[in-house]
Amino acid sequence: MMKKILTNYFFIRFLRALVTIFVVATFTFFLIRLMPGNPLDIFIATQLSQGVPLQEAQERAASLFHIDLSKPLLVQYVDYLKNLARGDFGVSIISTNTPVSKIILRFLPWTLFVVTVSLFISFVGGVLLGVLMAIYRNSWLDQILSFFASIISAIPNYVIAMLIVVYFGVKLKWFNIAEIRGSLSPGVRPEFSLYFLKDAFYHAMLPIIVYVLTTIGSWMLVMKSSTISTLGEDYVEVAKARGIKQANIMINYVGRNAILPLFVSLAISIGFVVGGSPLIESIFVYQGIGLKLSDAIVTRDYPVMQAIFLIITASVVFANFLADILLGVLDPRIRTSRS
């Protein structure tokens, strides 16, 4: 009976996730087309600003663009849904004859690489420091770490990125700004080799540092609060009365239960940052999906914008869905309440 109830619950949640994605995709489709300007006008305006005569600019636009913007909006929407149902994101307006899926596959892995590494470092570091703050709460160590976590969490990531570039790059010259641009050095190809990994980490180093600094504070504070709350539970007191070693209590009784609420936040964080930060990737000129989204917005490349927004939406929605399932599996109290 309980298994059936949980199955129905997760099935309903899955349907809600699909409906949410559909609604957001529809909203995004129409919102993008309500933006001032269209790809054709922006391309011609850019050509004119570069001194190209109007007639020549129009001829270039006619040879490059293969999209009928004169179609009724509803017809374009129906065509979009038909293509989406087949898994076809369409063809980029700006990158002539280039499938959007090919563009996504080219840029998305670099963002996923940065996101995975940075969230792993910040989550593990934040959890460990949060537990340490809870154990030594009200001490000078707790006060210093709490102050650091509060300050660093309040600073926007793009501000930290600009400070790193201006102060450490331009003023102190700790790194060459021009050399670190992009996701790989010229001539380096993706392959399973130490040289490739070193080069990839070198170019991703600054975005990773920014993401770690702007997320670790939240993990520290949430884990500290959750650990303090868990330390006051009856089962922890019973474990102490039974003479169980302090290390075992902290790992098996406190740590395991205190970390559960953080899994929801972790899943949501993964979903949100899959799209990358357009500002961060633009500041460091890191060739991820966020930088590509910025370029697509500027040029009004509708198919690319739609695909990236859809990926971000799906990531956030299904991250929430998976977090809900994960909590149900790991926490017996949630399974009991849902049944």
Question: For the regions a protein language model found, what residue spans apply to each?
Answer:
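Hydrophobic secretory-pathway targeting helix
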Residues: 2-29
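An internal, D/E-rich "acidic patch" concept
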Residues: 2-6, 68-127
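Alpha-helical transmembrane segments of integral membrane proteins
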Residues: 4-7, 108-141, 157, 170, ...
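Short, motif-level signal for alpha-helix interfacial/capping segments enriched in acidic residues
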Residues: 14-18, 32, 133-135, 302
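Hydrophobic alpha-helical transmembrane segments of membrane transport/permease proteins
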Residues: 21-75, 172-195
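Hydrophobic alpha-helical transmembrane segments of multi-pass integral membrane proteins
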Residues: 22-27, 73, 77, 116-120, ...
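Membrane-water interface segments at the C-terminal ends of transmembrane alpha-helices
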Residues: 27-34, 79-82, 148-179, 210-212
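Flexible, glycine-biased helix-capping/connector loops in cytosolic signal-transduction modules
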Residues: 38, 85-87, 276, 332
